[in-house]
From Swiss-Prot:
It holds the Pfam family PTR2. Keywords: Cell membrane, Membrane, Phosphoprotein, Transmembrane, Transmembrane helix. Its main location: membrane. This is Protein NRT1/ PTR FAMILY 1.2. Low-affinity nitrate transporter involved in xylem-to-phloem transfer for redistributing nitrate into developing leaves. Not involved in dipeptides transport. Expressed in shoots, stems, leaves, flowers and siliques. Mainly detected in larger expanded leaves, in the companion cells of major veins. It is a multi-pass membrane protein. SUPFAM superfamilies: MFS general substrate transporter (SSF103473).
């Protein structure tokens, strides 16, 4: 049975019936512009921020990187909170509006740190003889961190809600072209997001490097103001939907209910349907036998005390449906594979060190006659370009060509794609270590051991391969994981499927900080120069990269084990496969067994 609409939903239905003229294509420019401007503004701040912290706030490399790790963790965690508040309390329009204003205020505060000399340490040259440069005060840091916090809160409200809010405006079941309209919107939405990030990594970074922090921080603030105004001024045009109970609440209820009934005994036969609470129209009459201790959450211990006359549970924190129990089990089941993506996110979060490398190298496009220098913070665009090219070529060229050659549909299984992405991430860190070893030797041989600001006679284009590999890793693993979650979860859990990768990035930022602090602490003992020294030529960033590369290789092996242990995917079971593979299919090895090859001819092998 389905819950009847509550009073809020009933009023909303009546309201929408009388306002059929709201929503539609006319709202799209405002919603897409809000998301795009927010991305240009926020992503444009990150690439060069380590230089701002080092030069203007006198942070060391390790401390500055840790601050950015924390900021990244907050920016990736707040979308979960934003999605919960939007679904359960505020609604999408109000959440996006508040978040847009929060981002704008945060960027204004950050701009003020560049405009007002008194809110940061006085200018000082630490290399000058007899200079004693003071560090940042608590009040100065409070203003800086407040700016970061407000920007993170803004990201947490805009990013999880914009896509869904746009779909609300176009979702008209009476329109025979509804699916096509939604597909077109999703395409434009993601295209605008990709363009926005590219503009951030090129245009905003270029402004910061050539026109200074005052204009470099002022432009994002103005863009965010435009984004907020465009979105809010179009409010009369929007369709707004009432809030509902968050899926996170339902999962929490299942955990609490299972704990409260932990002392109860489960029935001997799992097909005792009358023992378990379920909706009349539910396909799940009894929970599965995996993770059986959670089955107690839907076990009816006293029908009179737990179920009302209307058939609904009187206390959902003591008795929940079989569907909620199975949703919780599905979430727990994917956690091992989800955790394998954390290491890749740790690797891609090392942009501060990569920027310092690029700053110390020759960034001219051509070393013969060219004066244009690629901004150090713009090298991240190669990651975005590689990601976009792979997605386009895989969908438009690789799959059609392979399918034509084989005479039947072809695709790489989602497990194989995730594994290949993790292996690419390992290669990216190994290449990073080798390039840094070469750069460091060059710097020392050219007499720059004590001068971290010197430009070494080596092209920064040597950094491009590692950026490209990071892009391919994200294209394979990040997209693969999202697809994996969507296919393995029930349809009701689609919002969690979209949030899990972001949560992994938040955890990765925290763990990256732990790894960095451990390396810094262990390698600087007894007065030794830290591997992550403020002086890039005295430190050993290459050793630090090798640590990450070794961890990445171990992670690939861990993924193989998790992939093998997970068993067949939902689609494979649905298609009636035996043990998750067809008779003509075989396992593909990268570093061991565990990647199921789907729809590949036996003559095609990958080593």
């Amino acid at each position: 049975m389905e819950n009847p609409p509550n009073e809020t939903e009933a009023k909303q239905i009546q309201t929408n019936e009388g306002k059929k003229t709201k929503g539609g294509i006319i709202t799209m420019p405002f919603i897409i512009a809000n998301e795009a401007f927010e991305k240009v503004a926020s992503y444009g701040l990150l690439p060069n921020m380590i230089m701002y912290l080092i030069r203007d706030y006198r942070f060391g490399v390790a401390k500055g990187t840790n601050v950015l790790f924390m900021w990244s963790a907050a920016s990736n965690f707040t979308p979960l909170l934003g999605a919960f508040l939007s679904d359960s309390y505020l609604g999408r329009f109000l959440t996006i509006s508040i978040a847009s204003l929060s981002s704008f205020l945060g960027m204004v505060l950050l701009w003020l740190t560049a405009m007002l000399p008194q809110v940061k340490p006085s200018p000082c040259d630490p290399t000058a003889a007899g200079s004693h440069c003071g560090s940042s005060t608590a009040s100065q840091l409070a203003l800086l961190y407040s700016a970061f916090a407000l920007i993170s809160i803004g990201s947490g409200g805009i990013r999880p809600c914009s896509l869904a809010f746009g779909a609300d405006q176009l979702d008209n079941k009476e329109n025979p072209k509804n699916e096509r309209v939604l597909e077109s919107f999703f395409g434009w939405y993601y295209a605008s997001s990709a363009v926005a990030v590219l503009i951030a990594f090129t245009g905003i970074v270029y402004i910061q490097e050539h026109l200074g922090w005052k204009i470099g921080f002022g432009v994002p603030a103005v863009l965010m103001l435009i984004a907020a105004l465009l979105f809010i001024l179009a409010s009369p045009l929007y369709v707004t939907r009432g809030v509902t109970k968050s899926l996170f609440t339902g999962l929490a209820q299942a955990i609490v209910a299972a704990y409260k009934k932990r002392k109860l005994s489960l029935p001997d036969h799992h097909d005792s349907f009358d023992c378990y609470y379920h909706m009349k129209d539910s396909e799940i009459k009894a929970p599965s036998q995996k993770l059986r201790f959670l089955n107690k959450a839907c076990l009816i211990s006293n029908r009179e005390e737990e179920i009302g006359s209307d058939g609904f549970a009187l206390n959902p924190w003591r008795l929940c449906t079989t569907d909620k129990v199975e949703e919780l089990k599905a979430l727990i089941k994917v956690i091992p594979i989800w955790s394998t993506g954390i290491m890749m996110s740790i690797n891609t979060s090392q942009s501060s060190f990569q920027l310092l490398q690029a700053t110390s190298m020759d960034r001219r496009l051509s070393r013969h006659g060219s004066s244009f220098q690629v901004p150090a913070g713009s090298f991240g665009m190669f990651t975005i370009i590689a990601l976009a090219l792979w997605v386009i070529l895989y969908d438009r060229a690789v799959i059609p060509l392979a399918s034509k050659i084989r005479g039947r549909p072809f695709r790489l299984s989602v497990k194989l794609r995730m594994g290949l992405g993790l292996f690419m991430s390992f290669l990216a860190m190994a290449i990073s270590a080798m390039v840094e070893s070469f750069r460091r030797k060059k710097a020392i041989s050219q007499g720059y051991a004590n001068n971290s600001n010197a430009v070494v006679d080596i092209s920064a284009m040597w950094l491009v391969p590692q950026y490209v590999l990071h892009g391919l890793a994200e294209a394979l693993t990040a997209i693969g994981q999202t697809e994996f979650f969507y296919t393995e979860f029930p349809k009701s859990m689609s919002s969690i499927a979209a949030s899990l990768f972001g949560l992994g990035m938040a955890v990765a930022s925290l763990l990256a900080s732990v790894v960095l602090n451990a390396v810094n602490e262990l390698t600087s003992r007894n007065g030794k120069e830290s591997w992550v020294s403020d002086n890039i030529n005295k430190g050993h960033y290459n050793y630090y990269y090798w640590v990450l590369a070794i961890m990445s290789f171990i992670n690939v092996i861990y993924y193989v084990i998790c992939s093998w242990s997970y068993g067949p995917l939902v689609d494979q079971v649905r298609n009636g496969r035996v043990n998750g593979v067809r008779e003509e299919e075989e396992l593909i090895d990268i570093v061991g067994k565990g990647f199921e090859k789907e729809d590949l001819s036996p003559v095609v092998k990958t080593n």
